Amino acid sequence: MKLQVAFDDLSLEKLDSILETSIQDIDIVEYGTLSVIRYGLNHLKEIREKYPNANLLVDPKIMDAPEKIARSCYESGADICTVMSVAGLKTCLKVLNIAKEYGKEVMVDLLNDLDPINTAKKLDEAGFDYLCVHSSTSDKNSPLNEFLEIKKVVKNAKLSIAGGISLENIDEIVKAGPYNIIVGSSVYNNENPKLVIDKFKEHLKWNT
């Protein structure tokens, strides 16, 4: 089971500081949506240059111009790029085609999908690498129940789970059996991010 840390609402200085102390313990480094908007893809390039072996995910949440955005992300050093399932299958497939061109991967985010179970089944059959079951920061509901239903229909894609995951509920999340767990503010809003990352990793080891 993998730990993905999403770096969104924080300064570049703090982002870089956390990576310096904990890059070896983060399985997937997520350059989050807010980082993309605030700092652009140039800083992603710098992260790639500094950490050539890191598994980097960039989260532009593609809805439009899929080929141009995906190409820019992969050329900036991303290993994985995100697209929204609500953008439609055709748009998602355009991102997948660009990913294949670069030998990279795609994560489809199911956030706000009105029919997530059927959508997940179709995306899985279409050959997408990752599917993310996700509740937004404005939604206080846990993504766990939806994840368990989607897990029943997905055969091949790697299932990710995100939204409100903390050290208080991590064991319950781990027992659901995702491929990777996505955490963010619970790490970078803590006074000791490295300690929190280490604790998350311990829980993943205990339960797998």
Predicted feature residues:
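Conserved N-terminal beta1-alpha1 strand-loop-helix module at the mouth
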Residues: 1-67, 75, 116, 167, ...
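Catalytic beta/alpha-barrel core
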Residues: 8, 28-37, 55-63, 79-90, ...
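Glycine/Thr-rich beta-alpha phosphate-binding loop at enzyme active sites
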Residues: 34, 119-149, 195-196
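Helix C-cap/helix->beta junction micro-motif
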Residues: 51-54, 102, 154-157
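Catalytic cores of alpha/beta
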Residues: 64-76, 114-126, 154-155, 165-183
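Expand to "…catalyze enediolate/carbanion chemistry for C-C bond making/breaking, isomerization
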Residues: 74, 80-82, 97, 101-110, ...
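Glycine-rich phosphate-binding active-site loops on the catalytic face of alpha/beta enzymes
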Residues: 78-90, 131-141, 176-200
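C-terminal helical cap(s) of enzyme catalytic domains, especially alpha/beta-barrels
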Residues: 95, 99, 150, 174, ...
